[in-house]
């Protein structure tokens, strides 16, 4: 399949919620987590948060439970239809617009978050202080964190969390032993703490993984910090790297990037960055073809992926050892480690270079996500597809084998709640659970 693209246009990717939908009062069975102020309810629509997969640590948000076999509602949101959009997502090119309100999801290893209009709800496992409430206890339902406000974007890591505010400030909290918090020390932070980086101006994009974190300034400079076990995932080069415990807790500029970047995604042991023109650069570990260059040569120096130099990428997402790229014409490519079926090519073979997922070729994909060893895609018609590791029911389709190597559509069981079929807007995937945000029209 030819993927030579002349220009990079993300023509409908801002996800402004402007469809002419009406909403009815939702069922009392699903908690109403958010609604506009009393004087701002003339133009509203109902969004619904659903979760599935393994939930022993509370990450599903529905109380104490072990597992959900299929997507189940967690909360309803009533939002202003004309002014809400999806919040900035790690690995996705940032829209120039800044709507009045934004909504977004994030899944960490065993914790989850929901962002609505600058406010952050967070829940799941609490070890290391990753929830930011001043303790390490788990929370089994979405709980508003009172220590943050005006949040624009959230990225959840393994045992830590990162938030970006509308003022361009970065806050981190949780386990600090890997240096992923960026506070020049390696102890835990039980409350959100401001990262005092050496950058000038505001930060406009963040990302994190299990052990390292990245941030991009408004001018396109990239800073990284956290763990680097000699694989080069921080992109900093010799003599600029880890010290205590293999971590670097000082945000440091990636000087070898020759051009400004607008989005970044942190994989397990590697890093991906996107330019404004849609060119994808990466660096770090490559023993499983994570860098998509056709060989296993890794390293700290950022380089473009040769086979994608004429392809316009609008979003990149990575798991532990694999990646997805979404092009501006709605195609999805995958590469890297494939033994759990996470590449979507109907096999469990590793993939040396990015290859289009043919099973999705008839769909126009608008959003992608990766878990540790699973993958997801949302289409322009609001459908959700998932594939990869299904051991913990994290694909949301009961009865699948533990390895699902081709995309399957996730179906939704809707109760008689006065709302119509779910129209999926976004998805987030953790190690063994997943969540999605759907729009519910009136039935």
What label would you give each PLM region?
Residues 51, 111-114, 122, 160-163, ...:
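Conserved core positions of repeat-based scaffolds
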Residues 119, 166-169, 178, 205, ...:
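Tandem repeat domain/solenoid detector
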Residues 104, 108-225, 231-233:
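A generic tandem-repeat structural signature
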Residues 35-39, 43-45, 49-70, 82-83, ...:
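Short glycine/serine- and acidic-residue-enriched loop/turn motifs that recur at repeat junctions
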Residues 383-384, 389, 400, 405-443:
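Blade-level signature of beta-propeller repeat domains, shared across WD40, Kelch, NHL, RCC1
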Residues 1-37:
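N-terminal mitochondrial targeting presequence
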Residues 64, 98, 106, 135-138, ...:
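Conserved loop/turn at the beginning of each blade in beta-propeller domains
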Residues 106, 114, 143, 155, ...:
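Conserved beta-strand position repeated across blades of beta-propeller domains
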């Amino acid at each position: 399949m030819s993927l030579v693209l002349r220009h990079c246009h993300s023509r409908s990717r801002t996800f402004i919620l402007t469809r002419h939908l009406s909403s009815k009062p939702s069922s009392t069975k699903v908690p109403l987590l958010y609604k506009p102020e009393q004087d701002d309810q003339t133009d509203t629509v109902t969004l619904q948060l659903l979760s599935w997969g393994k939930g022993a640590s509370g990450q599903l948000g529905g109380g104490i439970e072990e597992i959900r076999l299929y997507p189940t509602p967690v909360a309803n949101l009533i939002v202003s239809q004309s002014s809400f959009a999806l919040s900035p997502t790690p690995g996705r090119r940032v829209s120039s617009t800044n709507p009045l309100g934004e909504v977004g999801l994030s899944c960490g290893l065993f914790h989850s978050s929901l962002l609505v209009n600058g406010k952050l709800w967070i829940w799941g496992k609490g070890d290391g202080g990753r929830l930011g409430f001043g303790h390490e206890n788990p929370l089994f339902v979405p709980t508003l964190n009172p220590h943050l406000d005006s949040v624009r974007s959230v990225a959840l890591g393994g045992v830590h969390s990162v938030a970006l505010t509308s003022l361009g400030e970065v806050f981190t909290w949780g386990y600090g032993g890997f240096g992923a918090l960026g506070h020049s020390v390696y102890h835990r932070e039980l409350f959100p703490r401001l990262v005092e980086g050496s950058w000038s101006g505001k930060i406009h994009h963040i990302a994190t993984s299990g052990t390292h974190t990245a941030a991009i300034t408004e001018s396109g400079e990239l800073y990284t910090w956290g763990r680097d076990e000699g694989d080069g995932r921080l992109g900093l080069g010799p003599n600029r790297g880890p010290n205590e415990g293999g971590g670097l807790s000082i945000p440091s500029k990636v000087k070898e990037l020759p051009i400004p970047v607008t989005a970044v995604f942190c994989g397990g042991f590697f890093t991906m960055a996107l330019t404004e023109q849609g060119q994808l650069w990466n660096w770090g570990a490559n023993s499983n073809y994570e860098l998509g260059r056709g060989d296993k040569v890794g390293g700290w120096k950022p380089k473009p992926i040769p086979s994608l130099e004429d392809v316009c990428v609008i979003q990149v997402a990575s798991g532990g050892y694999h990646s997805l790229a979404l092009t501006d014409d709605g195609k999805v490519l995958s590469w890297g480690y494939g033994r759990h079926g996470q590449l979507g090519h109907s096999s469990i073979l590793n993939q040396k270079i990015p290859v289009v997922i043919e099973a999705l070729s008839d769909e126009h994909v608008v959003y992608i996500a990766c878990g540790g060893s699973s993958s997801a895609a949302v289409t322009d018609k609001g459908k959700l597809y998932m594939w990869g590791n299904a051991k913990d029911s994290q694909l949301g389709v009961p009865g699948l084998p533990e390895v699902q190597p081709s995309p399957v559509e996730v179906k939704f069981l809707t109760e008689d709640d006065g709302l119509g079929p779910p129209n999926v807007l976004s998805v987030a995937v953790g190690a063994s659970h997943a969540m999605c945000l759907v729009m519910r029209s009136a039935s």
